[in-house]
């Protein structure tokens, strides 16, 4: 392949799962190359799995290797602004990521998703529904399996979640459709400001046949003229129609499915489902054959996931909500006929939680505050009660629960005061839900 004609020495920067997938892919598809790895960590994860023919420089940079490289493949966790990478770029040596290598190698249709919130759910559900429609599907990227590993099995369609970091080093990814879900402040330690962050996200449209964008968030629209389809909370294009007590998902005026037929929780997940319909249609998949999969989809673990539904009480694990924006998204358009018992708290990371107050005011709410920074939530609602642990909360409220109520963990905080990570916190909630439901 002509892309590789003048490339002899490749340096992979950053090991871990992604770095290993790059090394494996290069050795399999371009065995003529000399591949070396640099990782600034003393004990990089995956070092023991590196083939012995591949040299590893650990604990710092190797500027000589970088100077001799014809191509540098960098990990998304390493900023392009890093001085050593800037030196490589100044010399004119191409710096790419694993997604760019995927773009060079893939020969089947690809759809991709980016956004500040919701992209993992959209990616996963797109894959689930495409499989239900009879396709062989490779799902990965920023979620689950690295993109290059997906190429090891043949597929009819690839569905990729792409972060802004991955998009920075991607320039030739051809897509049947690309979705930009929303934009909210994140990763400001990496970007100069919101404009830079948005510009990285917009790169997803560079070689896309169709842009799927959010009518309710103008920041998601491409800056260039290209075919666009929109999703949103009104009745246009992919939208929502309220008819009495029911809400319908619409595809250009046609009712597809009613929200009360879905196991997914929250209005933001209706928007996510609309994006999936748009992506499937753009990829030539008849989603009507997969509506049962949509009905039965409960969401990704720890993301608005129904973990118990007993005696009319739903227990929802949204432990992935480690910031205010995620909790606000989860609470918007919640359909609960009874009282919402909302569990919040943990490590607040210095955040100001007052933006939650107006949303709390609209809910039939019992606010249950726990963990290190639980006190920060106490002034936000008159119902707030302080607990020490999540188990204390559930022991106390379990006897009060009635049919129509919902118990939801959406803490708006990190977990490491009482748990190893948000997954462990969510698992603990799920166990308690099964015990007390």
Curated annotation (Swiss-Prot):
What is the name of the protein in this document?
UDP-N-acetylmuramoylalanine--D-glutamate ligase
> What EC number(s) does this enzyme carry?
6.3.2.9
Q: Does the keyword Ribonucleoprotein apply?
A: no
Annotated catalysed reactions: UDP-N-acetyl-alpha-D-muramoyl-L-alanine + D-glutamate + ATP = UDP-N-acetyl-alpha-D-muramoyl-L-alanyl-D-glutamate + ADP + phosphate + H(+)
Q: Which InterPro entries match?
A: Mur-like_cat_sf (IPR036565), Mur_ligase_C (IPR004101), Mur_ligase_C_dom_sf (IPR036615), Mur_ligase_cen (IPR013221), MurD (IPR005762)
GO terms for biological process? Answer: cell division; cell wall organization; peptidoglycan biosynthetic process; regulation of cell shape
UniProt entry keywords in alphabetical sequence:
ATP-binding, Cell cycle, Cell division, Cell shape, Cell wall biogenesis/degradation, Cytoplasm, Ligase, Nucleotide-binding, Peptidoglycan synthesis
Q: Where in the cell is it found?
A: Cytoplasm
Family classification: Belongs to the MurCDEF family.
Q: Which gene encodes it?
A: murD
């Amino acid at each position: 392949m002509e892309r590789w004609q003048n490339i002899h020495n490749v340096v992979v920067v950053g090991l871990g799962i992604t770095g290993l997938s790059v090394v494996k892919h290069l050795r399999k598809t371009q065995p003529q190359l000399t591949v070396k790895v640099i990782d600034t960590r003393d004990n990089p994860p995956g070092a023991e799995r590196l083939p012995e023919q591949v040299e590893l420089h650990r604990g710092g940079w190797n500027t000589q290797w970088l100077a001799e490289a014809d191509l540098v493949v960098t990990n998304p966790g390493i900023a392009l602004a890093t001085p050593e990478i800037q030196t490589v770029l100044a010399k004119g040596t191409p710096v790419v990521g694993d997604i760019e290598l995927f773009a060079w190698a893939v020969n089947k249709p690809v759809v991709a998703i980016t956004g500040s919130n919701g992209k993992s759910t959209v990616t996963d559900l797109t894959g689930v529904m495409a499989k239900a429609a009879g396709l062989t599907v490779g799902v990965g990227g920023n979620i689950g399996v690295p993109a290059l590993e997906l190429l090891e099995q043949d597929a009819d369609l690839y569905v990729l979640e792409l972060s802004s970091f991955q998009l920075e080093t991607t320039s030739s990814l051809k897509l049947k459709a690309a979705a930009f879900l929303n934009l909210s402040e994140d990763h400001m330690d990496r970007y100069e400001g919101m404009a830079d962050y948005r510009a990285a996200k917009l790169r997803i449209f560079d070689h896309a046949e169709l842009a799927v964008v959010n009518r309710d968030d103008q920041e998601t629209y491409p800056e260039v003229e290209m075919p666009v389809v929109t999703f949103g909370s009104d009745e246009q294009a992919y939208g929502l129609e309220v008819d009495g007590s029911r809400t319908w998902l619409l595809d250009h005026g046609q009712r597809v499915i009613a929200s009360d037929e879905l196991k997914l929780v929250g209005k933001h997940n209706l928007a996510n489902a609309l994006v999936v319909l748009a992506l499937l249609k753009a990829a030539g998949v008849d989603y009507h054959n997969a509506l049962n999969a949509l009905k039965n989809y409960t969401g990704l673990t720890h993301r608005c996931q129904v973990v118990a539904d007993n005696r009319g009480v739903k227990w929802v694990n949204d432990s992935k909500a480690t910031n205010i924006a995620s909790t606000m998204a989860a609470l918007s358009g919640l359909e609960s006929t009874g009282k919402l018992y909302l569990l919040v708290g943990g490590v607040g990371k210095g955040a100001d939680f007052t933006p939650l107050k107006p949303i709390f005011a609209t809910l039939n709410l019992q606010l249950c505050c726990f963990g290190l920074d639980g006190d920060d939530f106490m002034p936000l609602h008159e119902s707030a009660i302080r607990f020490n642990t999540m188990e204390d909360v559930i022991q106390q409220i379990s006897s009060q629960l009635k049919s129509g109520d919902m118990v939801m963990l959406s803490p708006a905080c990190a977990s490491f005061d009482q748990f190893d990570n948000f997954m462990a916190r969510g698992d603990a909630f799920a166990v308690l839900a099964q015990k007390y439901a």
